[in-house]
Amino acid sequence: MRRPDRTIRKRLKSLELHLKEENPILVSAVGGFRQLSRVGYAMGLLDTSESYATQIPWWPLISVLGTFSSGKSTFINQYLSYPLQDTGNQAVDDKFTVICYGGDKDARTLPGLALDADPRFPFYQTSDELDKVESGQGRRIDAYLQLKTCDSDELKGRILIDSPGFDADEQRSATLRLTNHIIDLSDLVLVFFDARHPEPGAMSDTLAHLVGATKDRADSSKFLYILNQIDTTAREDNPEEVVGAWQRALAREGLTAGRFYTIYDPEAAVPIENEALRRRFEWKRDQDLSEILSRIEQVSVERAYRIIGALEKRARDIEEHYVPKLRELIARWRRQVLIWDAGWVLLGGSAAAASRFLPPAMAANVDNGLAQLFASPLVMMGTAVVLVMGALYLHFRVRRWAAAKVVQEIKQEHVDEEAETLTRAFKRNTHMLRSVFCPDPVGWSWRNRRALKIIVSSANQLVQNLNDRFTDPSGKRPVVEEVDESESPKAISGEVVPREETV
């Protein structure tokens, strides 16, 4: 049985020790991922240097995406009450910034290597993925990523990711790939747009990437679309028209559900002379901001459900997606092998039949040669061995050729990690000792089928355990005393503590 290497075992043990203190329910989820990985190793879906547990983030993760000058960095600074990110009307940062809590009073900026080499953070081993997009980009990891720490209580227990200003027309393929990566990892995605641009139709390519790819996702509820700097519409008093224009732009990309949150920075807001109008804008801003902050506070809870959901999804994917796909690939390979084998047999039979139509003199020589061959058992046996070895050589050459052809088709039909996974698993089914007539993939035994059923059942039980923590349908649970208001989630006032002051 294939086992994970020592590094993976050590990482999972460390993760379990951390979760015992932070969220004991998720310790069982680590065990489920460990068992699921064993199935992946057996089928070739996973390399022994990998684990399904390391392919998802275990920290609550919030990503902030948006167009240039949409106020992403300003929002983060306000949320942290610290001017961590540089702000401006133009693109001021072209890197993905992972922001986490740090005990030092002064904020620190660490290079991309800090993320690429540490499995506790997102973007672990991202340099390898960048090399797949464009050779040599992995060495330039510091040009794409950076890690910042900040002594802000809002960062305790969660990680923020600030993305560079987005423009699909000019964005490099590596940056687009990183954007898709953080979208997949995140528990909450805040997508910022700039209300100062009244013609969202001109940004159709950007909307297509930021919005179009989300409408069919099972986790589409984790996306919040935020129309920032809505105060600029106060002069014409037309916020509804601006919001409507952006909603129509989203609808053109296929997103008909959902809503826009409209906010602005009170410190940099356009002066609104009309008292009633200012109060209306402030009320709407406070309402939407409160909802956004509430969703951020819920991320820790959503994280637990997301991890357990990922466990069940991976287990179902193996049985419902990878097994049928591998069966199809094996059948495709078998078909090509048998066609070529039949061709060699027909070619040999045709040659034997053609020998009967040779001129009489040549036919007599062939008959004499065969008579001498069958007259000596030793020579006959040696000839048979040579023929069998030749047939086996041709058969295994055909197997390798057919396997290489199927691998090439996999790379054409699938992209990136999916192609790599299918290729690795398919190759395990084409080794020399495996018959071409085996319909099921390597590792798809009754034991592993049973293991997947147990994993799915355990995941459902973990969801019930989480529900027991957060719900009480019968109403019999003792009422918990109300938390003091000073401990409740804060509202962003717009005031940012200067860099020089202690946070």
Predicted regions located by residue number:
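Transmembrane alpha-helical hairpins and terminal membrane-anchor modules
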Residues: 334-420
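Charged, low-complexity cytosol-facing tails and large interhelical loops of integral membrane proteins
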Residues: 167, 178, 420-503
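Cytosolic-side membrane-insertion boundary helix
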Residues: 302-348
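Conserved G1/Walker A P-loop phosphate-binding module
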Residues: 2-142, 152-153, 158
